[in-house]
Structure formats: C-alpha cells, structure tokens
C-alpha cells in the first residue's frame, strides 16, 4: 500500500496504482526481477510500447483508464473523443484556469502535478532515494563542478504516476540553459521499484539543465525517464527568458520524475512537506501550488 498525504484534508490517502500487481511482480519476485533485467528496463521495451501509444488503436484504452482512475476531464482542453492516441491523451493540456500560478516573487511553486518529497541540508554523496538507499549528485548528473554548488542545499523530488498531468513547468522567471542528456535504463519510478533498485535515478535515462532563476538562485532541474516513457520532450528554448509557470517540457507515456536541486539558503520549504518527508510520506501537490518561500 502506498499512502500519500493530502495537504488540504490533512489526511493520508491510498494511491490507486496503475498496474500495481504487475509492478509488485516485476520488482518483488525472483522471476519478475529477472524479466525486468532482461526486458522491461531496456530501451527497446519502452520504445515499442511508446510507439503503440502513438497509434490510433491505442485511443480505445482512454475511456476505461479515465473511469478506473477517476481522472477529472473537465479541466482538460479536449474531450475524450478528440484524442488521436493514448499518448495524445497522456500529454493532454489543461485549461488555463485549472492550475493558477502565484506570481508573487517570494513564492516557490511546484513545477507540476504529483507526489512530492523534500530533503534539506543534503549531503551530496548520500542523497536519500528511500530510507536505507542513497545516491550521489555527481552520479546523477555526471558533473562534479556543478554538483558542488548544491552542498547543504535542498533536493525536491516530484514523482508523477501515469494518471497525472505530465507536463512540467518553470518555478520562477529566468533563463534556462541547454539540456544535457544522459543515457540509461527504464526502471519504474514507483515506490515499489525505488525500494528495490539501488541508485535508481542514476541508473535511468535522464536530462538536466541549470535554470538561472530571478529569485531562487541557480536551480538544477533533472527529468528522469521510466518504464514505457518513450521520450522526455523539452519544449523550452535554451538561453531565452522564460516566465514563471511557462511549460518546460513533458513526458510521454509512463510514470516519471522531476528532481530539483536548490542552493543553500535560497528557499524555505513549507513545514508540512518537510515533516511528512521526514516520516517517509509523499505530499500530493498540483502545478503552481506553493511549496516554499524565498529566504530573505
């Protein structure tokens, strides 16, 4: 059971996991683990399934998916019948009023919808993946010089499951640099997998860039692919000013993760998120939601 903290109701909710039985089988049984290592983590598997999700035939899956996971289509720009494929639905745009952005320059917002975990005063060589498993920032981005800038800073992990809005956005106005791409595997980023695969974020395909924000210093943004994520698509223009809330990119089909690293003494994360993170619980958040404030 995966329990997630609801910041509005102050209660814990059980996450309805897409493909839960399959995920548990692939990451918690000997046969499943063997299949994962031989097939599921490979690019060809995710590429093949991603291609299927681009076909018109895959659109037949949409109504059942919406019903089974109670997805609110009232906030989507298109009706179910208007999507040409499952990927078209998966990367759906939302209405302009569904995710309000607080443009107060002191407010630090969530870059997308998902489940958030935050660690502060991070040790660059022992960043927590889950309790008992760690990784280093150097391994994650393969750049020692940039990694050092985030010593004792903050690590924000936003996990997206297949039912979520899968576009990610800029947390402030500023200048995004070029994207750096690192090849890797395609393990699931579900907590079941995170508890089973050491240094999972460093094993998977990922992309990163430095975002020179106007109010929160240089934000290191990392997008991590996952099983069946055919592509990480960057839609922003490098070295051109972006506004707070502007789209940075999106993930095609599959669960996926965005990780932000903040320099020391730039942002104070909200107390409830820090407390739940210490207890091992993710907090459910939406794009544009306040998750911290500027350190003055």
UniProtKB/Swiss-Prot annotation:
Q: Does the keyword Lipid metabolism apply?
A: yes
Q: Which InterPro entries match?
A: PS_Dcarbxylase, PSD-B, PSD_type2_pro
Q: Where along the chain is the active site annotated?
A: 113 (charge relay system), 169 (charge relay system), 256 (charge relay system), 256 (schiff-base intermediate with substrate)
Where does the entry annotate site (Cleavage (non-hydrolytic))? 255-256
Catalyzed reactions: a 1,2-diacyl-sn-glycero-3-phospho-L-serine + H(+) = a 1,2-diacyl-sn-glycero-3-phosphoethanolamine + CO2
Q: Where in the cell is it found?
A: Cell membrane
Q: Identify its membrane topology class.
A: Peripheral membrane protein
The cofactors it requires, by name, are: pyruvate
Identify the pathway: Phospholipid metabolism; phosphatidylethanolamine biosynthesis; phosphatidylethanolamine from CDP-diacylglycerol: step 2/2
Example GO BP: phosphatidylethanolamine biosynthetic process
* Pfam families in alphabetical order: PS_Dcarbxylase
EC number(s) from the headed UniProt entry: 4.1.1.65
PTM section of the record: Is synthesized initially as an inactive proenzyme. Formation of the active enzyme involves a self-maturation process in which the active site pyruvoyl group is generated from an internal serine residue via an autocatalytic post-translational modification. Two non-identical subunits are generated from the proenzyme in this reaction, and the pyruvate is formed at the N-terminus of the alpha chain, which is derived from the carboxyl end of the proenzyme.
Q: Print the keywords alphabetically.
A: Cell membrane, Decarboxylase, Lipid biosynthesis, Lipid metabolism, Lyase, Membrane, Phospholipid biosynthesis, Phospholipid metabolism, Pyruvate, Zymogen
Q: What class of enzyme is it?
A: lyase
* Quaternary structure, from the entry: Heterodimer of a large membrane-associated beta subunit and a small pyruvoyl-containing alpha subunit.
The name this protein goes by in its record: Phosphatidylserine decarboxylase proenzyme
The species this protein belongs to is: Clostridium botulinum (strain Eklund 17B / Type B)
Primary gene name = psd
